[in-house]
Amino acid sequence: MIRLHIIGLCASDVTKQTPRCGDAQIIDDGKNYEVIDGYCGKGANRLISALKKRKIYSPYLHITHAHYDHYYGIRAIIRDKTFSPKALYCYDPDSLRDVSKDVKDNKKALLNVINEAKARKIPVIYLKNGSIIEHGDINIVVYRNQPSKFSGNSDAYVNDGSLCYWFGNIGYLTTGDAGLDVAKRHKLFAKIIKIGHHGNNCVRVISRWLKDHGCKYCWDNDYSTSLTDFLMTGREDALAVGMTYFSVHGDINAIFRDGKAIIYKNGKAYSYLCDYVGKNTLNAATPYICRKVLRGSYGKADVRTTNLLNLGYSPTSIQNKINQIVEIATGIKDGKLDYGKNKARLQRIDAELGKGYGQLVQDYINVLFGVREKV
């Protein structure tokens, strides 16, 4: 099984002083852990916390491009002796050939991180267009189209040269801050995409091409605040052509197994078919875990989903188990219960989950993870 964990933020994480926070992703097959970019500011702290909570101490680190808001968390991992990274993947800073001050500063800052990694004897591997990374079930083809000329906008010059990672067996394309034209250029028929540069690097014509070729879902690191200086057009274009959009207000989680992907976001589940056939390694629901979920032990919505996946449980299995218990005990499916009128039947829920849970299920019925979309 492969899991994708996109670290989310909350509104308080983004301040007027630090509106640019980048993004961070953890993708793993249970043995190999890839950390792609690392936020800055509070986002970097959230990434470090997530890694330690999951006891991921030897990840592969990736920097998609030379903008600090995407790699300060990576630098923090390198500096933290708790971690022993297996390697650092990035591009050669010398591939940024422009001589403007901004680009020179970007190169110097990235080189400093690379030197810190080398000082800790972490292997540094430079990637280029066509590079391949294979770690267990994780297969990545790298695409890069660094502009040869400086257009007068240093951000655009560096963004457009981001490393784009194509996870073909799960249908996932993440682009750093590059434009999504990489998908059309290389015929990458993604099912879910990460829109680059806070949403403004995906033009309508590319969104339409992606949707026409099976792309159903997208996300970006637009925090939807008035504090950012960027025009958020990617989200609007993706929505306009019929994609489902996920924000990073809260975590985004996805699991891939048995030829199927399930994405968890905002208390709901979404799905699509994929080529990856790795077996499911999540635990099925038990009365014990159902009781704890109903009592709110793992939080709500995206927090709950992350916590359950961290513990190795399937959120969908838990939802289905609770729905099944309710339906068997009451004969009512997807409906509200009247505890007084259904007391005898609800006692059967108590017998399954423990005394007092009939009333709790009544109050909480069918609002845990939403209705799973059928493939």
Sequence positions of predicted segments:
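Core dinuclear metal-dependent hydrolase active-site scaffold
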Residues: 1-56, 126-189, 252-281
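Active-site environment of divalent metal-dependent phosphoester hydrolases
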Residues: 21, 42-43, 66-72, 95-98, ...
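Active-site metal-binding motif and surrounding structural segment of the metallo-beta-lactamase
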Residues: 30-34, 42-90, 185-200, 212-214
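Structural recognition of the beta-strand scaffold that forms the well-ordered cores
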Residues: 34-37, 59-63, 86-91, 126, ...
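Binuclear metal-ion centers of metallo-dependent hydrolases, dominated by the metallo-beta-lactamase
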Residues: 87, 95-141, 146-147, 155-159, ...
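Extracytoplasmic Gram-positive cell-surface binding/anchoring modules and repeats
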Residues: 283-285, 294-305, 314-315, 334-345, ...
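Repeat-associated, polar segments at repeat-unit boundaries in modular proteins
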Residues: 309-330, 352-375
